[in-house]
A protein has these predicted regions:
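Bacterial N-terminal signal peptides that target proteins for export
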Residues: 2-13
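N-terminal signal peptide c-region/cleavage motif recognized by signal peptidases
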Residues: 22-23
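Signature for phosphate-centric chemistry
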Residues: 29-144, 148-339, 343-455
């Protein structure tokens, strides 16, 4: 495990340096934007073993970059700034921030939760690379496509398959019935998981980060850039925006930080054209800390949290079982080129941890140290995806091989191999099936019942 952890760190550094040199977004921006990070691709191919060629792909992907999903943080920041403005208690930087947030509200109007243009572009590019990098896979036989019922997931699927429409003119996106989204929205079908999310330990952990002395001190420093001292005094004591909403200084600053993250769903030209830039309000250390505070929710609810085999990870078992079965069927029948699935970060992250992909399943102690072992921007950026690419040999007596990629990056799995990043399919399948069998999941027909009972 220490070797895998070390190799992941070295690999992360190499990719990070390349991104820093060639990407319009800096490494610091990526590390502070968490699951809101726009998708980044770095070409990293390893030669296929001699005599082998790709013939099938099993895939699960997150929707592309989107507009802010709801107005909550927008409203908090805007209402507090307007209140300060009415009382002439904004600094020049505060006035500029109010102007920017007003612009953000206009950009988001009538688009909450929809894919942004950047998101659409990223999805299209991922599908083009899948087709171009795997010419022996796409023979025009059949592609199965399924999405969650979310409009942005369905649109992501439609954009993705447009690349393949010339080869597959009758290609359609299928959806499980609204009340049976057990493959892609399994997180909605487990009573134990619903209880887990409301767990006092999780709530208290998140609150302890939000109200930590470091959070309060940094929030005060940022507030001084925006408000007069009199207004900061009011904000420290709490300002009531509604019957159930009292906003303190750190709540306001965290809301602004959330908007900073959300801005990354827009392209750099759009940000420049609309004069949107929050960099003057946060230092690098403040960005890193608030990223830790905000992204902790992902780590605890859809990451390894306190137990990398806990209920928040177990619930992805039906999806893993489906991928195992569809892969076996493709190998046996040789009648399908790919299975493509489109869903959410809440789908991809638990699956990655369940598969024990490097960098996804290490438990941090204390929780506040989680960024050293689990980086949301590397695991579940916008348009995140896991691809299983299958290879067969010209010689019938040779084993089927599989390469797993997380966000188009080759990754280590919890098995030994002499041909990294290629693993023998029978060995990998056995490893995962044993894991599922130990949890009592052996038949797709009982998935809903299993999700209802699993603890």
């Amino acid at each position: 495990m220490s070797f895998i952890k070390h190799s992941f760190f070295i690999q992360f550094l190499i990719v990070a340096i390349l991104l820093l040199i060639f990407s319009p977004l800096s490494l610091a921006t990526m590390m502070t934007s968490g699951s809101k990070t726009a998708y980044h691709y770095v070409k990293q191919p390893t030669a296929v073993p001699a005599g082998y060629q790709a013939f099938y792909i099993d895939h699960i992907g997150r929707h592309g970059s989107r507009y802010i999903s709801k107005a909550k943080y927008e409203d908090i920041a805007y209402k507090i700034l307007v209140l300060a403005e009415k009382n002439n208690q904004l600094t020049e930087k505060g006035k500029l921030l109010l102007t920017q947030i007003t612009t953000i509200k206009e950009l988001n109007k009538d688009h909450y939760g929809e894919l942004s243009d950047l998101g659409r572009k990223d999805i299209s590019l991922i599908s083009q690379r899948m087709l171009n990098n795997n010419p022996t896979v796409f023979k025009g036989q059949k592609i199965a496509v399924i999405s969650s019922t979310s409009p942005r997931a369905k649109e992501t699927a439609e954009i993705f398959i447009n690349t393949f429409k010339t080869k597959y003119p009758n290609l359609n996106v299928h959806q499980q019935p609204e009340d049976q989204q057990t493959l892609l929205r399994f997180f909605e079908y487990s009573p134990a998981y619903a209880k887990y999310k409301k767990n006092k330990i999780i709530k208290n952990t998140l609150k302890s980060l939000e109200n930590a002395p470091k959070s309060i001190e940094m929030s005060e420093n940022i507030a001084r850039l925006i408000f007069t001292s009199n207004f900061i005094h009011q904000l420290n004591n709490g300002i009531s925006l509604s019957e159930n909403s009292i906003v303190k200084t750190q709540n306001f600053v965290l809301a602004v930080y959330q908007l900073y993250q959300e801005l990354l769903s827009f392209s750099p030209p759009l940000l420049a054209d609309n004069h949107l830039d929050f960099s003057g309000y946060f230092t690098k250390d403040q960005l890193l800390w608030f990223s830790t505070v905000v992204t902790a929710k992902n780590y605890l609810q859809i990451g390894p949290a306190f137990d990398s085999n806990g209920i928040q990870i177990k619930i992805a078992a039906p999806l893993l079982l489906d991928m195992l079965k569809t892969a076996d069927s493709a190998i046996a029948n040789n009648n399908i080129d790919a299975n493509l699935r489109f869903a959410h970060a809440e789908t991809v992250s638990p699956l990655a941890t369940l598969m024990e992909i490097e960098g996804t399943n290490i438990v941090a102690n204390p929780v506040s140290d989680y960024p050293s072992v689990w980086q949301a921007d590397k695991i579940i950026p916008m348009a995140a995806n896991i691809q299983w690419i299958f290879y067969k040999s010209e010689q019938a007596d040779q084993p089927i091989l599989v390469k797993v990629m997380l966000n188009e990056r080759e990754v280590h799995l919890p098995l030994k191999t002499n041909d990294y990043p290629y693993y023998q399919w029978d060995e990998l399948k056995k490893f995962y099936k044993n894991k599922l069998n130990n949890w009592g999941l052996t038949d797709q027909g009982v998935v809903l019942k299993w999700l209802n009972k699993i603890k």
